[in-house]
Each structure stands twice: as C-alpha cells, then as structure tokens.
C-alpha cells in the first residue's frame, strides 16, 4: 500500500483566498493535505450619514429650497470652536482579513477513477475575518464630533448639579462646571441652564445605523460615535475553528505530462452560526441592531446570511516526486 511515497505541491485560488498546500497519499484511497491561504485586502468603501439627534432632518423644504438643519448649526459652531470642518458623512473602508491553516483528508471512492474525491477537514485561523475603519480624511469631522458629544455629556451632568443647587441640596461651589481652563470655569447656573436648553433641544451627534432595544425593552436609534482615539471601527468575527466538507474533481493539466494536474474543490466551511459584526463600542450590528438601511444594511444582511461559507477553490498541482 502506498504510504507517503510521493509528494504534491499546489497553488490554490478561490473563495478561501490565495494559498498553497502539500499532499501525500495514506493508502490507496486516502490523501492527506495541509496548507495555508489568505484573502488579499480588497477595499470596499462605505459612507455613513452624520446627524444631530435621533430624528433625521430634511435639508430641503417642500419647494426644494435648502434649509438650515440642526446639523448645520452645530457644524458651524464646531468649526468656530475647533477650526475643524464637520462633514455630514463619514467614509469607511471595509476589507477582508482572513487567513487560515487547513488540514484536509481527501478520499477517492473509485479506485479506477481517481479524478473524483470527497474531502473532510478543517480551517483554523484568527476569529476576525474582516474589519472596517474610517478613512484619514474623516478624522477632522470625527474629532469635532467627539468634542461636541463631550460638551453635550458634560453639560447634562452640570445641569443635574444645577438642579440640585436650585433645590437647596448642594452649595454653589459644589456645582459641577461644564469645563475649566486653569482657574476659569463655566459653573454659572444661568450659563449652564442656557447651554443645556440649546444642546438638549438638539441631542447628541453621531452616525445613525438602525434601531436597537435596551435592557428595559425601549427601542431607540443606535448612534455610532467615535472612540477615545477619534475613530470608528468594526470587526467581523466567526469561530477560529471551522470544519469543512466538500467534493472535488481533478485531472491532468497537460495531456502528456503527469507532473501537472488541476483540481476543483466545491464545499462548505462551517462558521458556527452567523458572523458577529462588532463595533468599537461593543455593539453587535448583526444581532443587536435592526433596520439598518442603505449599502451598509445590505452588507450586514449578506454577512448575517453566511452561516456556512461557500468554498470554490482551484488547485494547480505539481508532483514533486
């Protein structure tokens, strides 16, 4: 019986990426194959709208005239304060990042016709298979957006302390300032209340993606906002260990040369359920958020549908000995 009496090397191209493997027989009907494959980082551009508050505003009136929105007002304020121009959309780049080791067992059920084979095995690699991040050109807008939300949040906290002061629960010096620069502080109750009135009528600024339900069962708009680094990111994750089952067909590549062969493998890589799409704040877009619209929503629905990843690979084989 032939055990490890010859060795094949292959270049692989297909839905698992670009890679290589080596194979050797283990008996008359079985071949052991191992290799590695990676997917080149093909970039896909996506755009996210930026808005103030949870309700989307129209930029035009009934007559088609451009009107000033809450976003326009806040963008002008932020540009005046920070010098950064805030755009009404943020561009992100999505790319595949997966690469896997693979171990396969090919079984040739027909001893007189070794063109057909059945394959079982597994892929193993990082759980992150894709990611997304904002482009450099979006950084000024994201930094300004983060500054606005910081001002908004601190104003809400300061306003609560002013209300306690109004009720006589705390002393004037215990009022939490909106911010301080050296010894200068914005802690005047009147100033804080005026700022609160303006900002609370607008809401926080962010990129609305869809609806999500909190722990109390209340539905609200999920607004993606930049992290502490002023960036927005997302990752697509699956199980690291991914079983595989498939079939294949192969034959000689050149009519009179047994050293060169080609084989096509068709099968399924089992991801262990729908992939998770995790943003930088820990939100799972595939499970926690629904009703995502536009191109981003299309991508999310496609990714959610791939509980099993279709494998279509072509192997160009060279017999070393």
Positions of PLM-derived features:
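Short loop/turn motifs that connect adjacent beta-strands in outer-membrane beta-barrel proteins
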Residues: 1-6, 29, 110-116, 131, ...
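Transmembrane beta-strands of outer-membrane beta-barrel pores
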Residues: 13-17, 36-42, 122-128, 251, ...
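A C-terminal functional module that forms or caps the active site or interfaces directly
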Residues: 260-264, 273-277
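Long, hydrophobic N-terminal alpha-helical segment
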Residues: 6-41, 91
């Amino acid at each position: 019986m032939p055990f490890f009496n010859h060795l094949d090397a292959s270049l692989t191209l297909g839905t698992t990426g670009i890679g290589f493997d080596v194979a050797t027989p283990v008996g008359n009907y079985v071949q052991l194959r191992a290799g590695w494959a990676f997917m080149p980082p093909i970039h896909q551009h996506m755009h996210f709208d930026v808005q103030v508050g949870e309700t989307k505003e129209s930029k035009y009136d009934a007559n088609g005239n451009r009107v000033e929105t809450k976003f326009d007002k806040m963008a002008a304020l932020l540009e005046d304060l920070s010098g950064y121009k805030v755009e009404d959309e943020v561009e992100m780049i999505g790319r595949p990042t997966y690469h896997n080791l693979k171990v396969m067992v090919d079984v040739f059920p027909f001893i007189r016709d070794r063109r057909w084979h059945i394959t079982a095995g597994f892929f193993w690699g990082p759980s992150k298979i894709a990611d997304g991040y904002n482009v450099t050109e979006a950084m000024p807008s994201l930094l300004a957006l983060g500054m606005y939300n910081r001002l908004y949040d601190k104003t809400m906290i300061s306003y609560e302390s002013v209300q306690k002061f109004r009720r006589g629960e705390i002393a004037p010096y215990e009022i939490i300032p909106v911010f301080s620069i050296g010894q200068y502080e914005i802690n005047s109750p009147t100033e804080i209340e005026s700022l609160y009135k303006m900002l609370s009528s607008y809401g926080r600024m962010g990129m609305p993606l869809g609806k999500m339900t909190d722990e109390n069962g209340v539905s609200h708009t999920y607004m993606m906002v930049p992290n502490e680094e002023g960036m927005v990111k997302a990752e697509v994750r699956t199980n690291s260990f991914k079983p595989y089952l498939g079939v294949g067909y192969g034959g000689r590549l050149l009519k009179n040369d047994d050293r060169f062969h080609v084989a096509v493998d068709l099968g399924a890589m089992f991801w262990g359920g729908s992939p998770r799409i995790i943003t930088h704040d820990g939100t799972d877009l595939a499970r926690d958020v629904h009703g995502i619209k536009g191109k981003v929503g299309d991508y999310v629905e496609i990714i959610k549908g791939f509980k099993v990843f279709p494998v279509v690979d072509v192997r160009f084989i060279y017999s070393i000995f």
